[in-house]
Design a protein with these regions (language model features):
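Acidic-glycine-rich active-site phosphate/pyrophosphate-binding loop
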Residues: 1-10, 41-56, 228-247, 279-297, ...
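Flexible, glycine/charged-enriched surface loops at secondary-structure junctions
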Residues: 43-47, 88-93, 115-116, 190-196, ...
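Signature of multi-pass transmembrane helix bundles
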Residues: 108-247, 411-418
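Glycine/charged-rich beta-loop-alpha catalytic/anionic-binding loops adjacent to active sites
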Residues: 9-18, 55-63, 243-254, 294-304, ...
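Early transmembrane hairpin of solute transport permeases
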Residues: 27-126, 130
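A structural signal for small-residue-enriched, beta-sheet-centric alpha/beta enzyme cores
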Residues: 20-24, 54-58, 62-65, 142-146, ...
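Hydrophobic alpha-helical bundle architecture
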Residues: 36-39, 65, 272-285, 295-361, ...
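Conserved phosphate/anionic-ligand binding catalytic regions in large, soluble enzymes, centered on
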Residues: 19-35, 250-267, 308-312
Length: 418
């Protein structure tokens, strides 16, 4: 494999597979809150939170960790202000104390807090302004969860960066299924081992916690009533989401900015490897395939849209499972196409308990997509949104998610705000 392309793929994995505690959208608000408080220097008595529609959608119904079960935008901002560590970025509230939670409650009860929708070209856009009687500070994050566009204190600029361009990073344009498969077969394990070990450790732990605890609708435990292996692959992935969406304080290694997608591309592969007693190196290579495939699928769709991210992650999971079963590149590609043909209509209506069920359905689509092709069955080019050739189908999904479902996204947000 070309050395430059090899290094690009390693760089993409290092950029995308990062650790986060809690659903990433409320955590981004908490991060903005921690930065704003640090800039102001004191706890504010007035807070203005301006957010894009997709942030409203993804924060409204999800429990924020370390808040005693509280949900929503105000909660995320206030725990960031009272207990956040700005240096920790997506783990900003990982070291919150009981005193911080008490202070959060007091702040929510005493401060003037206003949430406003923000008209923005970015699906991810947060502008948080805090003040006391003497000073004011503002933090603006846009494009990605930790990309600071602007910071000010008393209208004096502290940070001013160019907003991320609404174009795809050139690194990501190099992704193709052929090169992903080649990279996974050839990658030096030491180049990805530390990254993937962290994913295995973190994502296994929260999946197990979801199976042990009582979180949300307990989708994982419901599915696990059936003891067969395909059910367990779905169950453990769903259990991780059960826990994550409902306030579990364990971290997750994310994919494409999403913890749920990180769980979907990893946990079924980890469980399958353990149950089938496969070697660790094979798991590493399968995780390379599933992670890069999910990133490839999401590149044109975008970080936040009306297209459920579990769908693309479930198809990517199917590709990883195919690799674990010694499948060829051809089988892997048909697995992905079949899976996308099954589940691509699932909408994203925000982060919440039902995400776990959508993960289970999407993993099932990945499994079925593989089983179909291994039994001589497939969906063909011309069947709905499927085109001849894997890359053409991936492009169709990208157009559907980014352009075709834009108005759907607005209607979902409108319904959720009623």
């Amino acid at each position: 494999m070309d050395k430059k392309l090899y290094e690009t793929y390693v760089r993409i994995l290092n950029k995308e597979l990062v650790t986060a505690m809690g659903c990433t959208e409320p955590i981004a608000i908490a991060y903005a809150g921690s930065l704003a408080r640090k800039t102001l220097g004191v706890i504010p008595n007035k807070i203005l939170i301006e957010v894009s529609g997709n942030i409203i959608k993804n924060v409204k119904s999800v429990i924020v960790p370390h808040t005693h079960g509280n949900k929503g935008i105000e909660t995320a901002a206030c725990i960031g202000i009272t207990g956040g560590d700005a240096e920790a970025e997506l783990e900003v509230i990982s070291h919150v104390t009981e005193e911080d939670i008490v202070a959060m409650t007091e702040l929510m009860n005493s401060a003037s807090i206003k949430v406003q929708p923000l008209e923005s070209p970015y699906s991810l856009d947060i502008r948080l302004t805090v003040s006391n009687n003497e000073h004011e500070a503002m933090v603006h994050i846009a494009g990605t969860h930790t990309h600071i566009v602007e910071m000010t204190k008393d209208n004096e600029t502290i940070v001013c960066r160019e907003a991320l361009k609404q174009t795809i990073d050139e690194d990501y344009l190099t992704l193709t299924m052929h090169d992903i498969y080649t990279f996974a077969k050839e990658v030096e394990i030491d180049d990805v081992k530390e990254l993937l070990d962290q994913m295995i450790e973190c994502n296994t732990a929260i999946a197990q916690e979801g199976m042990n605890g009582d979180y949300g609708a307990n989708i994982g435990k419901v599915i696990a009533i059936r003891k067969d292996l395909p059910s367990l692959l779905k169950a453990y992935a769903a259990a991780g989401s059960d826990a994550r969406m409902n306030g579990c304080e364990l971290p997750v290694v994310i994919n494409s900015g999403s913890g749920n997608q990180g769980l979907t591309v990893s946990v079924p592969l980890i469980v399958y490897t353990e149950r089938e007693h496969l070697d660790k190196e094979k798991l590493y290579r399968a995780l390379v395939i599933s992670n890069l495939t999910a990133i490839h699928l999401k590149t044109e769709i975008g970080r936040l849209s009306a297209f459920c991210g579990a769908v693309s992650a479930g198809a990517a999971c199917g590709a990883g499972l195919a690799y674990l079963k010694d499948a060829s590149e051809e089988v892997m590609n048909h697995t992905i196409v079949n899976a996308l043909a099954i589940t691509s209509g699932i909408i994203c209506d925000g982060a919440k308990a039902s995400c776990a069920a959508k993960i289970a359905v999407s993993v099932e689509a990945g499994i079925l997509g593989y089983d179909m092709y291994m039994n001589g069955q497939q969906f063909y080019g011309g069947d709905g949104i499927i085109s001849k050739g894997i890359e053409n189908t991936i492009h169709n999904i990208g157009v559907l998610g980014s352009q075709g479902m834009a108005s759907t996204d607005q209607e979902i947000i409108k319904i959720m705000c009623e």
